[in-house]
Structure formats: C-alpha cells, structure tokens
Amino acid sequence: MNPVVISVCVMLVLALMRVNVVVALTFSAIVGGLVAGMSLGDTVAAFESGLGGGATIALSYAMLGTFAVAISKSGITDLLAKSVIKRLNGKESAASTTGLKYAVLVALVLVTMSSQNVIPVHIAFIPILIPPLLGVFAKLKLDRRLIACVLTFGLITPYMVLPVGFGGIFLNNILLKNLHDNGLENVVASQVPTAMLLPGAGMIFGLLLAIFVSYRKPREYKETELTVVHETDHSINKQHILVAALGIIAALGVQLYTGSMIIGALAGFMVFTFGGVIAWKETHDVFTKGVHMMAMIGFIMIAAAGFAAVMKQTGGVETLVQSLSTSIGDNKPLAALLMLVVGLLVTMGIGSSFSTIPILATIYVPLSLAFGFSPMATIALVGTAAALGDAGSPASDSTLGPTSGLNADGQHEHIWETVVPTFIHYNIPLIIFGWIAAMVL
C-alpha cells in the first residue's frame, strides 16, 4: 500500500475520533514512514527536520493573537460590534434580521476575498477581525460552521480564478509555469483563469449550499465574555480608537513591505504600547493571552510541517501519481476522476495546494495529452487537483485560519466544525465540477 494514502487515512480517522490533531499528525507520519520501509530513527529524523518549516507560521500566529488582544483592549472592536447590534435592535422583524445576517455574510466574503488580492495578508486578518464579532454572530444566531465555510470560500476561490495577489502566484507563477515545463508550451496566461471558472463555480455552489441549506437554521452558543456585547453605554476613549487605527495601518503596511506577519504584528503592537493603549507593565499579560489563544493552531502548523516532510521523504507522493498512469487503461472519464482524487490525497498529505502543482504536473500533463484532453481541460484538471484538499484538510491554513478566530471562546471544534463542513461543501463539488470541466472543455 502507498504510504501517503495510509498516512492520510490514519490521520483523518484519528482526527475524526477527536484525537488531538497534533497527536494524529505525529502518529500518522510515523506510520507512513514505517510503511514506506524507513526505520523508526529515519522517520523521526525526517519528521523533526520538517518541524522548523512550521515555526515561522506558528510564531506568526502567536504575534497575531497578541495583536488581536491589543486591538480588543482599544475598544475599536466594541465600537464595531455595537454598531451592528444597534442596527439589529432597531429592526426586530424577522425579515430585517435575516437581511442583516446576509449582509454580514456578504461582508465577510468580500473581506476574506480581498485578503487574497486587494490587500494580500492571507489569513492574518482572521484572528484580529473574527473574535470581536463573535458577539454579533451570537446575536444573529449564526452557525459558526457556516462562518467557517464562508471564510474558507474567500481564502480559496480567489486564487483559483483571479490572477492577482495570491492568485497571480498560483495561476501564473506556479500552474502556468509547470504546464509549460511539462509539455503545454502553447498555453497562454489568459487561458488559465478561464479554464478554472467551472471549478470555481463548484466553490460557489458549495457556499450557497452551506448558506441556504446546511446551516440556515439558527444556532445558539453559551454566553461568554466574547459572545456578549454589552449594550450599556460607556465612554470610548477616542485617542485609543485613533491609536488602534494607526496600529492596524502600521501592521498592514509593515507586513506588505517586509512580507512578514511576525514583523507586521510586532509593529502594530508597538504602536499600541507607545500610544498608551497598553501599559508597559501589561505587555507580558497581553502577550500571554495572545499566545494562549493561538497556541494550538501554531502547534498544528509545526506538526503539519513535520508530517509533510515525512511524506516527501517516503517517495510515496511520486509513486502514487505514477501508479495512476499505469492503472487507468483507456477510460477517459475514469482517468479524470482518479486524477482529481489523487490530487485530493496529495494536497491533504502535503497541506498546501501551491506545493502540490509541481508534483502533479510532471505526470498529469503528459497523461492528459495521452488521453486526448484539450489544453483547457488539462489546465482545469491540474489546477483543480491541486486546489482539492486545501479545504477540508486538518493541517491547511485555509481551515486553521477560520478555526483560530471562531474558537477564540472555546466553542468551535476544529475537525467537526471546520474541517468536515468545508470538506463536504467544497471538495465534493470541486471533484464534480472539475470532472465536468475536464469532460467539456
């Protein structure tokens, strides 16, 4: 059996049994190494060698958590939440409440999508924006599984179809380049997003299904410090609001300039400190709260990097892709389906759709040409196979990001309330729409 398939299946089974994700990743990595014939020592060494790859992201999450706590202390998030609650209180009818609910969802989609291209900060905004809005979600009785689906949609769909920001990297720098390198020299940049429109429609279908069918019923959460918006008026320090705005601008500007979430969050935090929002003696407590809020996400990222390192070391990814080409026969529809399913397994094993393309394109492009798939169909196959698994993977930042914000009060479970809903609503439609694209383009 292929070690990647075994490892991914073991990881998913353990995670679904509510075993801690870090434990599930570590154990399944060891299982994969042993299945591949590696010694226990070599497997552990490969796992440990990969841990450093997740350290940067883990520290980024810790700093973002600290920055989020600092923002909440300024009162700017209370101001934002109260403005929404004020609108809600003035409109008690069911129709008005429903309208406001959909307005909030649309706003979240737009903000999340803009984080991929307009202001390319990726998931950095989630731990900052979402925790203060938990009170609004509770007031509107929004199911957080729906919010997770909305956020994941906004994180993935833009890079699949829009060639700007992270989409420019995915579609042009990685997908187009690897298509050229593996035999599709005549494909031009304008064809790539066009070919990905139908798979992108699958993402839209999944989002609409989540909003109007799966999670349309109201859901109530326990009252906590984060889910209760205090409606009693108290004076808001205007200077603190100004400092908060400057801190957010500073964090964003520094991150875009340096390319580092760590330095960006640090710059924003220092603005809050020098601006008087946080006293010097409180900095330790604020940092501790921020790290506590983001610690589990950070450790999952570190363990995921180790897991990916073992998967690459086993050689199982290449073997899995190559075995596909020898087992299909002449069945074109089956070939398209199996290519997508293998892409799903590889992306869930590696944890990054961006890293999956070079692995898949090496075999998929010649295989697609041999089966007579058109260049547009080949683009759709490779692009969709890579994007598959980004949603619904326990170790993907497209699921860890939403959980980091929604679980700020401990009422949102990563596997059953982010991973499983996004897997069902996005991976299944992506397979269906990706397969249709391969057949009709």
Curated annotation (Swiss-Prot):
Compartments (UniProt record): Cell membrane
Principal subcellular localization: membrane
Record keywords, A-Z: Cell membrane, Membrane, Transmembrane, Transmembrane helix
GO cellular component: plasma membrane
Origin superkingdom: Bacteria
Keyword Transferase found: no
Protein name: Uncharacterized membrane protein VP2115
Protein species of origin: Vibrio parahaemolyticus serotype O3:K6 (strain RIMD 2210633)
